[in-house]
């Protein structure tokens, strides 16, 4: 399948550069995945579309301030490091710039020596294995010295770090935010609970591969990056109860979707406690096994994320919705507006 089938025209001015002052004031497009019918709402209207017995699945990963600026100890040359994933102990898989200056044995100093890293291995595309040394607690030092790794299409400086975290972020380990969750406030989540909507939590640590464009000409040639996920016994039991009682499982974001669909695929359609690495790639033709609805942002043209949404809601429906979003000047990407996709979404609005 040609990746150009997932292309659309997006004016640059529609790429949201900063978050809205209030999280829940973003707009919400409601898309019926079967009919393609569209409604234009605001995010707080999600209350009208979720009902007692439904369950929202939220990714409680927390973004690391994963971008570090340091200098080579021997020459003083500036080096930028992006933490991707922790391997063993203080060893990390990273991206460095400029990569040609960092070879095995190179020592990089951050914060006037408060944190040091030695290169212990190299990989393609600027990948380097670094082993860190420090006095104290690594994540406290990282919090002091690191910057939030905003996506490359965001050019503005983020004034408030918390705006690139969900209000329920808990498990540190992501290089990017699960952005569909950024629209929820604690007050909105409380209103949903009061209405009888259940909240279930999983963890999937978002990797930088999320922002890597598909370089292959066809979908089938593309290989997804692997990301770590975890679902507890408590969450699995809750989701199975919801299913048994006729409620809907609504995932917040493509990360929650990937987690549930990975587990269901690996366990004959069942949801159970599980941890591991997933490189699941969902595109048209994939049959969903776990979810009934999806809340997600508006994604990049030709990205694996728009392919996932197209697998769930039909490519023609999704591209029509995206063209409507452009026409109606919705805000796109990480700090942009949201879409709620489900079967008979309009019919469920009470």
Swiss-Prot record:
Pathway(s) served: tRNA modification; tRNA-queuosine biosynthesis
Protein localization: Cytoplasm
GO cellular component: cytoplasm
Keywords: Cytoplasm, Queuosine biosynthesis, S-adenosyl-L-methionine, Transferase
GO molecular function: S-adenosylmethionine:tRNA ribosyltransferase-isomerase activity
Transmembrane segments: none
Classification via Pfam families: Queuosine_synth
Domain of life of the source: Bacteria
EC number: 2.4.99.17
Example of a GO biological process term: tRNA wobble guanine modification
UniProt KW S-adenosyl-L-methionine keyword: yes
Catalytic reaction(s) noted: 7-aminomethyl-7-carbaguanosine(34) in tRNA + S-adenosyl-L-methionine = epoxyqueuosine(34) in tRNA + adenine + L-methionine + 2 H(+)
Quaternary assembly: Monomer.
HAMAP family attached to this UniProt entry: QueA (MF_00113)
Role according to the record: Transfers and isomerizes the ribose moiety from AdoMet to the 7-aminomethyl group of 7-deazaguanine (preQ1-tRNA) to give epoxyqueuosine (oQ-tRNA).
Recorded family membership: Belongs to the QueA family.
Name of the featured protein: S-adenosylmethionine:tRNA ribosyltransferase-isomerase
Phylogenetic placement of the source organism: Bacteria, Bacillati, Bacillota, Bacilli, Bacillales
């Amino acid at each position: 399948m040609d990746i150009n089938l997932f292309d659309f025209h997006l004016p640059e001015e529609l790429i949201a550069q900063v978050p809205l002052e209030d999280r829940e004031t973003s707009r919400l497009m409601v898309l019926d995945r079967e009919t393609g019918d569209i409604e234009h709402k605001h995010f707080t209207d999600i209350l009208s579309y979720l009902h007692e017995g439904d369950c929202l699945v939220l990714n409680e990963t927390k973004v690391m301030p994963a971008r570090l600026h340091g200098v080579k100890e021997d020459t003083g040359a500036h080096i930028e490091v992006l933490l991707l994933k922790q391997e063993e102990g203080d060893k990390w898989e990273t991206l460095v710039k400029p990569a040609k200056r960092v070879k095995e044995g190179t020592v990089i100093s951050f914060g006037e020596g408060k944190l040091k890293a030695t290169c212990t291995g190299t990989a393609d595309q600027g990948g380097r294995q670094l082993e860190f040394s420090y006095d104290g607690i690594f994540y406290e030092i990282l919090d002091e010295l690191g910057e939030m790794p905003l996506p490359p299409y965001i050019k503005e400086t983020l004034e408030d770090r918390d705006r690139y975290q969900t209000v329920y972020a808990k498990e540190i380990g992501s290089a990017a935010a699960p952005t569909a969750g950024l629209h929820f406030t604690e007050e909105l989540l409380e209103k949903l609970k009061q209405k009888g909507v259940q909240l279930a939590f999983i963890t999937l640590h978002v990797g930088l591969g999320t922002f890597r464009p598909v370089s292959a000409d066809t979908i089938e040639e593309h290989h997804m990056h692997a990301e770590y996920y975890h679902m507890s016994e408590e969450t699995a039991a809750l989701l199975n109860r919801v299913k048994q009682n006729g409620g809907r499982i609504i995932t917040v974001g493509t990360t929650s979707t990937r987690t549930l669909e990975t587990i269901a695929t690996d366990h004959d359609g069942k949801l159970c406690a599980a941890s591991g690495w997933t490189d699941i790639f969902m595109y048209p033709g994939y049959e969903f096994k776990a979810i009934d609805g999806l809340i997600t942002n508006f994604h990049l043209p030709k990205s694996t994320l728009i392919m996932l949404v197209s697998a769930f809601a039909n490519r023609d429906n999704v591209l029509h919705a995206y063209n409507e979003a452009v026409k109606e000047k919705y805000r796109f990407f990480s700090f942009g507006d949201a879409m709620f996709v489900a079967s008979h979404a309009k019919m469920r609005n009470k």
